[in-house]
A protein has these predicted regions:
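Acidic catalytic loop of the alpha/beta-hydrolase fold
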Residues: 201-206, 232
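Conserved alpha/beta-hydrolase catalytic His-Asp/Glu region
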Residues: 116-118, 136-189
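Active-site loop/oxyanion-hole signature of alpha/beta-hydrolase fold enzymes
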Residues: 41-80
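Flexible "cap/lid" loop of the alpha/beta hydrolase fold
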Residues: 96, 102-132
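Short beta-strand/loop motif that positions the catalytic acidic residue
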Residues: 191, 197-199
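Conserved HGGG/HGGXW glycine-rich cap/lid loop of the alpha/beta-hydrolase fold
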Residues: 4-52
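Catalytic histidine-centered segment of alpha/beta-hydrolase-like enzymes
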Residues: 226-239
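Gly/Ala-rich beta-loop-alpha elbow adjacent to hydrolase catalytic centers
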Residues: 83-87, 91
Length: 250
């Protein structure tokens, strides 16, 4: 797995994990805002790395590989792990691995594991997979119907279409199957990490089950509503607010 590093001279380390259907350069707007004060680790996740012909494995496997890479490179403490959507699921599993000390774990619109019968989760994963395959085939014209075009430009949607065309069928299937069904330990270990769950004002209804899950499973979670945004919009549409929220973690 390729890990891109910025601001290596800084002491505080932040791990930034991108969502699905984008590349690591999802963070290109916020990197200049953060690299003066933080050492940034930005992985190019398998299946979404244009420089590495690989397939997505699973949320759990990627979290294990990230923990292994961080430890092997001599880093003993992470100031914050931030993950958006799929990246939030990986961020949590990195934290639960407890291989390194992590001060903050931030999940932005993270999708929690479905609490549904196995066969139902198969149908949901299949629906998501087919939607992405249709988007890959239809390109921008179909993606414009699937996204709120007031929030995302035609160039943004072209970017998503290009990423989808790069992704293998295996990557697309595993992404949705794993994000919907990754395994959080039944008995959560005691954590010294502060857990944060951020979600956009425009997705509050869609995240209701996820919010309830976090309250039940991780009662210490600090919740933050992101005003006037939709899912995964913070980094792309309000990078200055993102940097400000990182600075305020304490």
């Amino acid at each position: 797995m390729n890990i891109h590093e910025f601001g290596k001279e800084n002491k505080k380390i932040i791990l930034l994990i991108h969502p699905s259907v984008v590349k690591w350069d999802y963070f290109e707007v916020v990197i200049p805002l953060l690299q003066e004060n933080y050492h940034l680790l930005v992985p190019a996740l398998p299946g979404y790395d244009f420089e590495n012909d690989s397939d997505f494995s699973s949320v759990e496997q990627i979290a294990l590989e990230l923990n292994g890479w961080i430890k092997a490179n001599g880093y003993t403490e992470i100031y914050a792990v931030y993950g958006c959507s799929m990246g939030g699921s990986i961020a949590l599993m990195v934290t639960l691995g407890q291989m390194i000390k992590i001060k903050h774990c931030i999940m932005d619109g993270r999708i929690t594991p479905y609490q549904l019968p196995w066969i139902v989760t198969r149908f949901i994963a299949l629906k998501d997979y087919l939607m992405m395959m249709i988007g890959r085939t239809g390109g921008v014209a179909l993606l414009e119907k699937a996204f709120a075009t007031d929030d995302y430009s035609k160039e943004d949607l072209q970017y998503v279409a290009d990423v989808l065309r790069h992704c293998s069928r295996k990557t697309i299937w595993r992404t949705f199957d794993s994000c919907n069904n990754y395994k959080v330990p039944e008995s959560v270990p005691k954590l010294s990490t502060q857990i944060h769950y951020w979600y956009a004002e425009g997705e509050e209804k869609e995240r209701k089950l996820d919010i309830n899950y976090m309250k039940r499973k991780f009662p210490q979670t600090k919740f933050e509503v992101l005003p006037k945004l939709g899912h995964a919009g913070l980094v792309l549409l309000k990078p200055e607010l993102f940097a400000e929220m990182i600075d305020k973690l304490g």
